[in-house]
Amino acid sequence: MNAQLNIMEGAFAGMFDHAGMFPPAELNLREAVQAYREYQQGGHAFALQCMVVRAKDLDVLESALHENVRDLQLSVVAAGDDLDAVWKHLDREMPIKMFEMKATEPSQVARLKKMLPAGMEAYVELPMDLQDMQLADTVTEVGLHAKLRMGGVVAETFPSIAIVASMLRDLFKRGLAFKATAGLHHAVRGRYPFTYREDSARGMMHGFMNLLSAATLVWFGGEKDEVVEKLEEEGLLAWRVTEHSIRWRDWD
């Protein structure tokens, strides 16, 4: 059991951010902070990285929590117009570790890179159905990372398996690291409620184990049909944790 835990810690270290104020949880700020701190002390703390907040939440967070904010690690979701306000909070030593921004033009990416403090990670959300790869090329050239939106609160926001497989291969060709957001609330692909509300619609959602396995396969040169097969998997028992690896069917 200890060996299996070590494998899990190695595979999932810092892999998950806490986005408690976003769907499906939709907590208020205080509830989200409390939940994040509880997770920091929990049995899976090794897998936790940042608490995700919007740029507009920073003023409230700072004034409401005062010095108690220093033990957080924040990832700030912002638009280009928010950059100056975010840097103001950095000057006041807010614990901002990561920055996330949606971009539609290469010039927005270049501006973000120019303004970004040294050593801070930044992820640029790319359209999943990229026809023109200039945006991804610019993210690569300036040394930032990609962000993939894997779903939302309605079925139409979930990219198809074919689109996800193509995007993973496009990112790999560029050596572009990525994070994924939205819709990855379950380990394995399946039909789930989109939110925690009683009247929530249901639909097919991607699984984070599917995405992790597919991305790993792309890294090691897997063919597109093999990548698609992993993204399609709906059986939780298809994955097994051994002393030396996490296995998917016949793959380590």
Predicted ranges, named:
Residues 1-111, 116-122, 132, 219-252:
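Alpha/beta catalytic barrel-like cores
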Residues 106-170:
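Domain-core and long-helix interface of multi-subunit machines
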Residues 39-41, 134, 166, 199:
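Short, flexible coil/linker segments at or flanking structured domains
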Residues 52, 100, 125, 147, ...:
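Residues in well-ordered beta-strands of folded domains
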Residues 56, 77-81, 102-106, 127-129, ...:
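Active-site beta-loop-alpha junctions enriched in small/polar residues
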Residues 142-232:
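Catalytic alpha/beta core domains of metabolic enzymes, predominantly
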